[in-house]
């Protein structure tokens, strides 16, 4: 069929239907959302859980949510800006931080449901494929599905780092190794060692060593926060190992105490009747004194 010019007449505007608001804003892929949200009809009121991962300029957000008519309900959430509490003070948006955030989310969720002792996940980080299976006589493994949003799901994306962290933390999420760093599309082989290096931040450490040798100024500029916090390339692996152990030890979110705000009043408060009468009496007395002084002089 050839090119057909759209005639924008009265009928066109009368029948025009706008897309959903979040589609117009470019925030939601409804084609993907429909498939992530719709539950099997024979499961009735059982929620279909999604693991939502969003990467911003300075943070990584991981949430477990399910859909309702009123809107999505968040069951549990973890953020990369919580990682300094566990010893990771720098590089809060890299692949290793994404893994830590996913691990924190999984441990926090299982702790909330009292399943953290049943499903320990993969304690030793190998980078290899691992799947959580339900244990007989115990509650089934918590199953959810990855919601990557509008992120381009290329091999090595940080979204899959968070996924791997959640799976190693004890959540059952369907996945394959094809999108993890270390997968070679030509040979169709997956290198767990390469993936482990990314989880432990060794790719960043190698680049730091390269910059120290090649361009000292570029190193000082790009890794200023690492220098400020005394983080060297040789410390990286140990830092992440300690962080993983600390997350498993205490994944619970601690609420910050509310600050008591003293309200400032910018206008004068209204006077009571007694104050008003007193003010009038003072003005009268002042006026009479002034009159007396004038008469004496």
From Swiss-Prot:
Positions where Phosphothreonine occurs in the chain: 232
Q: Which GO terms describe its biological process?
A: ribosomal large subunit assembly; translation
Q: Which residues carry this modification: Phosphoserine?
A: 185, 272
**Where in this protein does the record say N6-acetyllysine is found?**
5, 48, 220
List, in alphabetical order, the Gene Ontology terms for molecular function in this entry. 5S rRNA binding; structural constituent of ribosome
Q: Location of the Glycyl lysine isopeptide (Lys-Gly) (interchain with G-Cter in SUMO2) covalent cross-link?
A: 220
Domain of life from the UniProt record: Eukaryota
Residue ranges, compositional bias (Basic residues): 258-268
Q: Which InterPro entries match?
A: Rbsml_uL18_euk (IPR005485), Ribosomal_uL18_C_euk (IPR025607)
- Please report which protein family the annotation says this sequence is part of: Belongs to the universal ribosomal protein uL18 family.
State its role: Component of the ribosome, a large ribonucleoprotein complex responsible for the synthesis of proteins in the cell. The small ribosomal subunit (SSU) binds messenger RNAs (mRNAs) and translates the encoded message by selecting cognate aminoacyl-transfer RNA (tRNA) molecules. The large subunit (LSU) contains the ribosomal catalytic site termed the peptidyl transferase center (PTC), which catalyzes the formation of peptide bonds, thereby polymerizing the amino acids delivered by tRNAs into a polypeptide chain.
Q: How does it assemble?
A: Component of the large ribosomal subunit (LSU). Part of the 5S RNP complex, which is a LSU subcomplex composed of the 5S RNA, RPL5 and RPL11. Component of a hexameric 5S RNP precursor complex, composed of 5S RNA, RRS1, RPF2/BXDC1, RPL5, RPL11 and HEATR3; this complex acts as a precursor for ribosome assembly. Interacts with NVL in an ATP-dependent manner. Interacts with RRP1B. Interacts with IPO5, IPO7 and KPNB1; these interactions may be involved in RPL5 nuclear import for the assembly of ribosomal subunits.
Its name, as the record gives it, is Large ribosomal subunit protein uL18
Specify the species: Bos taurus (Bovine)
Question: What phylogenetic lineage does the species belong to?
Answer: Eukaryota, Metazoa, Chordata, Craniata, Vertebrata
Quote the gene name from the UniProt entry. Answer: RPL5
